[in-house]
A protein has these predicted regions:
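Extracellular and organelle-lumenal recognition/adhesion modules and their flexible linkers in secreted
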Residues: 2-263
Length: 263
């Protein structure tokens, strides 16, 4: 038996419940992603792999096998029939199943799909298979796959994940007498929640209007404020006692990753 779990994001299209089902949006920009089994790893936008501390599993004859690829979402209905369509090496496979429920030990109820007796895909040693796309439809009607316009797909993904690459750009900043350098990042679309923040540890530089400068590791920032289409970042400028001044922050090669992806 193999067990697959597909989960559904907000802002779905008319029929396909999945975002980035053809894997074209890859804001992190890596060519490969590795899951060591200790935590959930996100790869291309909206898709993750995990074998540890999760109810999601792929099993064969009761034995857990490879890490499942999954997408989290919140509109699955228990008792409703769903149809998954998957194209592997351009061969289209379909399967319909009724949604069920799973009670966790924290008294949360998870709705999931269990696929029994699915098509088996044989991979020879050192061989590869290409998943062209995955669609999920409510009901038993299978719709023809429509590749989403990249710009639209990117905006839908950016509600959950936004990656800003500095690439030498500069932004206005405020350097205030409490000893902080503050600048605002404008988002291309509203994120679904206040995101977490990580960076690639590259150096950014604050320069005041008096040409005084201070460099910082980009990961030292604090997400100070989150608004409808903006994020305000704060860095410990350490110039205590100075009057409020206007300056510029040079992002250099820093990459800022803001994520609302489910854990």
């Amino acid at each position: 038996m193999k067990k697959y779990h597909f989960l559904n994001p907000k802002g779905v299209t008319a029929h396909n419940l999945l975002i980035n089902g053809d894997f074209q949006v890859n804001q992190r920009g890596q060519s490969s992603y590795t899951c060591d089994g200790t935590k959930r790893v996100y790869g291309v936008d909206m898709w993750s792999f995990s074998k540890s501390n999760t109810f999601m599993k792929v099993t064969e004859n009761g034995i857990e096998t490879n890490a499942p690829i999954s997408q989290m979402f919140n509109k699955l209905k228990s008792g409703m029939k769903y149809t998954v369509v998957c194209s592997v090496d351009n061969v289209v496979l379909t399967k319909s199943i009724v949604g069920g429920t799973y009670d966790t030990d924290t008294s949360q109820t998870i709705v999931y799909l269990t696929f029994n007796n699915v098509e088996r895909i044989l991979v020879t040693p050192n061989g590869t298979q290409t998943i062209n796309y995955i669609d999920l439809f409510e009901g038993e009607v299978v719709y023809k796959h429509q590749k989403e316009d990249y710009a639209i797909a990117l905006l839908r993904c950016q509600r959950w994940l936004y990656v800003l690459r500095g690439n030498g750009q500069q932004l206005p900043c405020d350097i205030i007498n409490t000893g902080e350098g503050i600048f605002t990042i404008h988002l291309p679309t509203e994120m679904i929640n206040k995101p977490t923040f990580v960076s690639n540890n590259e150096i950014i530089k604050f320069v005041s209007d008096g040409n005084n400068s201070k460099s910082y590791n980009s990961n030292m920032g604090v997400l100070q404020k989150f608004g409808k289409n903006m994020i305000r970042m704060s860095y410990p400028y350490l110039a205590y006692g100075i009057p409020n001044v206007i300056g510029m922050v040079y992002l250099e090669n820093a990459t800022f990753t803001f994520s609302c992806e489910p854990l």
